[in-house]
UniProtKB/Swiss-Prot annotation:
Encoding gene per record: TXNIP
GO molecular function, one term: enzyme inhibitor activity
Gene Ontology annotations of biological process type: cellular response to tumor cell; keratinocyte differentiation; negative regulation of cell division; negative regulation of transcription by RNA polymerase II; platelet-derived growth factor receptor signaling pathway; protein import into nucleus; protein transport; response to oxidative stress
Keyword Hydrolase in annotation: no
One Pfam family recorded for the sequence: Arrestin_C
GO CC annotation: cytoplasm
Stated role: May act as an oxidative stress mediator by inhibiting thioredoxin activity or by limiting its bioavailability. Interacts with COPS5 and restores COPS5-induced suppression of CDKN1B stability, blocking the COPS5-mediated translocation of CDKN1B from the nucleus to the cytoplasm. Functions as a transcriptional repressor, possibly by acting as a bridge molecule between transcription factors and corepressor complexes, and over-expression will induce G0/G1 cell cycle arrest. Required for the maturation of natural killer cells. Acts as a suppressor of tumor cell growth.
Subcellular location, record wording: Cytoplasm
Protein name from the UniProt record: Thioredoxin-interacting protein
Amino acid sequence: MVMFKKIKSFEVVFNDPEKVYGCGEKVAGRVIVEVCEVTRIKAVRILACGVAKVLWMQGSQQCKQTLDYLRYEDTLLLDDHPTGENEMVIMRPGNKYEYKFGFELPQGPLGTSFKGKYGCVDYWVKAFLDRPSQPTQETKKHFEVMDLVDVNTPDLMAPVSAKKEKKVSCMFIPDGRVSVSARIDRKGFCEGDEINIHADFENTCSRIVVPKAAIVARHTYLANGQTKVLTQKLSSVRGNHIISGTCASWRGKSLRVQKIRPSILGCNILRVEYFLLIYVSVPGSKKVILDLPLVIGSRSGLSSRTSSMASRTSSEMSWVDLNIPDTPEAPPCYMDIIPEDHRLESPTTPLLDDTDGSQDSPIFMYAPEFKFMPPPTYSEVDPCILNNNVQ
């Protein structure tokens, strides 16, 4: 019977545990080993991997694909430590043994660390502890990588615009049209930036319509010639109702980019894309939707912030902006100061769901709840007779 010797601790520790690495940067750390009794160590090895993989079931068929970004192997040595026979290290209890390692990430484009429903981009370092007559022990530690996306390139700083018109009918009878045209100042944004929307809406149909805008994430997975697409609305803003025969305009209506992962556009099996949808809800008909592509970057320079602030200054100011106190005071309640058309919907709201918690139809189409007054307290004495007796 073989008795397995217990290892007290065996772990991978990075020199900078919170760091997010980029292409060409060095990943450094150490493998720490502690034993409970005298133990002979044959070798300590590491394997560093970076891989994108997708997996889902298409009926009875398994759709699976992988793409390697990184693979590095090395056998680690202790500095100034005596070795026993056959170049083995003799470890004793009470001591901490540290094996240092380091490697550089590839210079080419790397997939940003990501975890989705049907795929992920993952990076890790796995350490192996080899002992004679003992099973190999393993430990694993993940680290994050971000492929830098510079949003200050000429292509991403150029304005984006689109327009669309939809004819509306009722029981195959023409009922006018709804049109929308929109423009944003740039295509590339970073977390915390404001997207300033300039849009014009025209409603010549007999119905009351509602304009909205939303930031949408689209995850695309590709494997075995099959494609899987998931779309989710991250945040949104809405405007006022537009009655029949009227027009409306947005001049710098803003929508903030929340904390989201940068776009992943260079991976052949997994893509993370973002869009600004500007759409009009038409009761009893399909929505009129404009699709403006966005690129969410990982690097925001001064020009990005300056452009955003300049656009915001020229935009329409709401009453919220005009009521900022001169002296600091306790912050007011969010629901008290933010108008309904500026409130963000839940991040888990499905894309363009009609039941997103807001009433798209005109307010007079919803009958207010009428409450009757409660009946008076019952009494066997007629108040009229009582009044006549008093007189």
